[in-house]
């Protein structure tokens, strides 16, 4: 076998590994996932002799309230779901109707299904609107308001309950007053912000619910979070491919060694 043929054989054997590694690198670097926002602490640990720094992101605490159907519900009832939250009150004559209308359009876009629906089940998205005037916004009032905007009750809650709990949740858990250019009074949560929460109850984005560009970004980020996997766990397929890549490498080395050995024997016999 000539050197040219040997090179061709090596390329043919190494090509599957090379393609896999290139695709893996491209898939990991091509898309920027929505960032985390609320940092609790930073911890350091030693792993195999190396100092590793881990960021511990704030996990949103649970809250128990009542929805527009009169059901007692909690945030943690929606385990494994991506959540889009906002704050409103039914008697609002300024921004709230527009916020609710935009949230409704967002919900309907996922119900009908876009390109993302071909790959992922959009039923994992939950919309939650917290009333900041719960004394007036009773269950019947919320139900009438929801029906007015064509709310699908299956994955959109409008919640009422204890005012202090709602306000504490807004400021201490979702921190709606942070990363904002608009002033938000601690006495009345009147904000145009939509908050994106991932499957682990961690805040992944703040958006202007009155701005079409910001809402489009929210829709995109929802899709990205739907595709997000637990990075701490390697998939079985990935592990098998890694094992096979070592097998390919061993085969290549054996073939090259065998070819070189046969060539050396021919020279000796010649």
PLM regions with names:
Residues 1-59, 255-270:
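N-terminal targeting signals for export/organelle localization
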Residues 58-60, 81-82, 189-191:
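Short, small/polar residue-rich loop motifs at catalytic or cofactor-binding pockets
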Residues 73-103:
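Short active-site neighborhood of thiol/selenol oxidoreductases, capturing the structured segment around
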Residues 95-115, 139:
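Typically the conserved alpha-helix immediately C-terminal to a functionally engaged Cys/Sec
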Residues 117-137, 153-166:
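Thiol-based oxidoreductase modules, predominantly thioredoxin-like and allied folds used
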Residues 139-191:
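Short, internal strand/loop/helix patches
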Residues 182-269:
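Thiol-/selenol-based redox modules, centered on thioredoxin-like
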């Amino acid at each position: 076998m000539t050197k040219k043929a040997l090179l061709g054989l090596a390329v043919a054997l190494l090509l599957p590994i090379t393609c896999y590694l290139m695709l893996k690198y491209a898939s990991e670097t091509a898309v920027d996932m929505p960032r985390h926002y609320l940092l609790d602490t930073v911890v350091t640990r030693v792993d195999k002799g190396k100092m590793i720094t881990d960021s511990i992101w704030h996990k949103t605490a649970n809250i128990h309230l009542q929805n527009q159907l009169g059901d007692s519900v909690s945030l943690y009832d929606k385990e494994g779901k991506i959540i889009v939250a906002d704050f409103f009150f039914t008697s609002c004559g300024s921004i709230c109707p527009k916020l609710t209308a935009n949230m409704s359009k967002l919900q309907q876009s996922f119900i009908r299904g876009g390109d993302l629906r071909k790959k992922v089940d959009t039923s994992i998205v939950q919309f939650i609107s917290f009333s900041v005037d719960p004394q007036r916004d009773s269950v019947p009032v919320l139900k009438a308001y929801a029906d007015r905007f064509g709310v699908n009750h299956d994955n959109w809650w409008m919640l009422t309950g204890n005012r202090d709990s709602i306000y504490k949740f807004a400021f201490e858990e979702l921190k709606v007053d942070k990363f904002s250019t608009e002033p938000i009074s601690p006495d009345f949560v009147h904000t145009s912000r939509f908050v994106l929460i991932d499957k682990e109850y961690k805040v992944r984005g703040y958006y202007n619910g009155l701005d079409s560009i910001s809402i489009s970004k929210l829709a995109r980020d929802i899709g990205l979070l739907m595709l997000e996997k637990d990075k701490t766990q390697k998939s079985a397929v990935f592990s098998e491919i890694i094992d096979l890549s070592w097998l390919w490498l061993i085969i290549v080395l054996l073939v090259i060694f065998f070819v070189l050995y046969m060539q050396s024997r021919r020279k000796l016999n010649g």
